[in-house]
Amino acid sequence: MRIARRILPLLATPAFAQARFPNRPIRFLIPWPPGGSLDALHRRMFEVFQQDTGQPVLIENIAGARGTRGATFLVQQGRPDGYTLAHHHLSIIRHPFLTRQPTWDPVADFTYIMQITGFVFGTVVRADSPYRTWADLIAAARQKPGELTYSTSGIATSNHIAMELLLERERASMTHIPFRGSQEGVTALLGRQITAISDSSSWREQVLAGQFRLLSVWTPTRLPSFPDTPTLLDLGYGMSVTSPYGITGPKGMEPEVVDFLHRAFRKALLDEGSQRIMAQWEMPNEYLGPQAYTEFARERAAFERETVARLGLTID
């Protein structure tokens, strides 16, 4: 009888009633094309996860729709069993406020598991560009409204909104060229198809190789790799932009599964190889656990609602 009493509490836990979690591969949706710091960090973390749990995390890159396809899948088709997860970023929290027919609640319709880090944004031009400083680029954008172009990874993304705020403040105008991911912007700039990139650090290798020139970084402090490049704070804008991101699942996940995933991913993030990638790409530490990440999403949703309304942004 004592044995039976010890087993019953385990059987009462739905997530672990049938078998130990995880007992099959986990699907992970990334709504951007492969490449860059995000891709490198996730792949290393998932290697560690597999070593620790015996199960792989299989990445699926599903680019498009301003980085919201992963969230759309979680809301419309995801089962709350822990076997389908997705990369989660600020555009997903912002998305419902951009349309008259929102398809999800940015807090209630997701299970927030762990915030990881944030993007390192900056503005770059080709090394042979006539614009040697941020001030040069802004002056030209003011003199030739709409003629200069800049790319981001999508309409109404954090970097798109930030760039438009900067241009508005400077009474300047550039034409926005949205791509499905930051790597496409690198290709376009290499091919002289655009004037500049204002996006995450997929441009890093080209800057180090002397192909691109970095005009500004959007981090709170200067980057050790580019100590001579000013931040937006240095330039007098009083702002920084990192756009933190993390891991979520469908709403309604069992707390035991969330706790298991959080602990496993936290261990993977603290792995020496993962930390080496973060240092290499100079990625900020934006870690939050499930409760703090959920609270962050709730507070950020209020901020995004106000910002979108103030700027009159819409995707309808």
Go through the PLM ranges and name each one.
Residues 23-25, 168-172, 255-316:
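An extracytoplasmic/periplasmic, membrane-proximal ligand-sensing/linker region
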Residues 37-41, 45, 66, 70, ...:
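Stable alpha-helical elements in mature extracytoplasmic
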Residues 76-83, 97-184, 232, 242-277:
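Hinge/capping helix and adjacent helix->loop/strand transition within the periplasmic-binding protein
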Residues 90-92, 118, 128, 201-202, ...:
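Solvent-exposed coil/turn segments that connect beta secondary-structure elements
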Residues 105-115, 151, 173-177, 204-240, ...:
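Short beta-strand->loop
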